Amino acid sequence: MVIGGEDFSLKGGSPNAAGLRKSIYTEELALKYKVPLIRLHEGAGGSVGGTNQEKSNRPTSDAVYTPSRFISLANTLGEVPVATAALGPVAGLPASRLVASHFSVMTESSLVLIAGPKVVKRALNIDVTKEALGGPEVHLKSGVINNFAKTEDDAFEQIKTFLSFVPDNAWTFPASISTTDRIDRCDDLLVDIIPKDRRR
């Protein structure tokens, strides 16, 4: 498997040109070797300093002929299992990569935000806390995140369990597990367990 993500201890996990290339590289690596991709996220969105061109005359954006940075992301979703974990604050571009997965889990101390409270205040003149904007309670209800984990270790175990149910790629079968459960067994409990709201 391939493991990637953002590290908050390095420039707040803010993506710059090199960081984005690394994210794309992990996706391309998973596609090349046809193995599951795991992303561990704890990072902010783009930094103002990262887009500042005063220090260099070189352009910071991609050339027009450069392939979209989301092509490899879309391809992984069609070819290999993608599991992600929010292990702290996740905002901006890292948040989009977090939710673009087959399985996502969020720890108690994590946040998933497109933008923070200051941006909301400026745009809508509404005071809101980070937790009310993007905490686990919000996203478990909205369907942005699949599961909740009390700790990082719990999140890792949930990812491990998820990966045990799926094949390594679209060209292989999942592992066959012996069971005493009857093939023709029906359970009415499933009618209530599966939410009618497709976003949950």
Residue map of PLM features:
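A structural preference for short, pocket-lining loop segments at secondary-structure junctions
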Residues: 1-7, 22-53
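Conserved catalytic cores of soluble enzyme domains
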Residues: 35, 41-171
